[in-house]
């Protein structure tokens, strides 16, 4: 029994370490990627060149944030303005993640969460938006069939673009 208990404790401790090492999303960014940083600062943070494809799309473009494609970074007018998270591997500071049920997000963010029907799918698809106290930043969850399918964070206006770059 002692061996089983020790094994279980090691397994749980190992899981906790993995969870603690994963980046978390806030109004201000994910890991080393910060809202408001320049494209050059983003290049340094990512360890690779940041350039739009095709080059004439420099006004607004997306860059993969990591090799696992768990998030992407929107650069508009030379600055990071929004980050789109598509993987459950990156939770918010409150613990919400892709794959969570709408009710779980409501419970985490409470009455401050603004709910709107999804632009394309309508109800039951929703946008659940949580604003910073000064309303400069937002965290927006996009849902499909009662489950978070993606979420965005960053400056309030770009987080509400339904098409990403305009």
Predicted regions and their residues:
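Second-shell loop/turn segments in exported
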Residues: 26-33, 89-96
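A cross-family detector of function-defining hotspots
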Residues: 20-23, 37-79, 86, 97-163
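Bacterial N-terminal signal peptides
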Residues: 5-14
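Generic hydrophobic-segment detector
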Residues: 4-6, 26, 85, 89, ...
């Amino acid at each position: 029994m002692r061996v089983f208990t020790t094994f279980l404790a090691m397994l749980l401790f190992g899981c906790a370490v993995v969870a603690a090492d994963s980046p978390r999303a806030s109004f201000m960014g994910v890991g080393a990627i910060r809202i408001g940083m320049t494209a050059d600062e983003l290049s340094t943070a990512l360890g690779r060149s940041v350039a739009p494809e095709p080059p004439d799309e420099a006004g607004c473009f997306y860059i993969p944030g990591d090799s696992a494609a768990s998030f992407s970074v929107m650069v508009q007018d030379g600055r990071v303005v929004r980050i789109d998270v598509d993987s459950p591997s990156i939770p918010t500071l409150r613990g919400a993640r892709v794959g969570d049920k709408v009710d779980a997000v409501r419970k985490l963010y409470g009455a401050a969460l603004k709910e709107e029907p999804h632009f394309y799918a309508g109800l039951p698809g929703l946008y659940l938006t949580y604003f910073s106290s000064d309303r400069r930043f937002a965290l927006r969850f996009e849902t499909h069939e009662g489950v978070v399918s993606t979420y965005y964070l960053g400056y309030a206006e770009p987080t509400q673009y339904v098409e990403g770059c305009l």
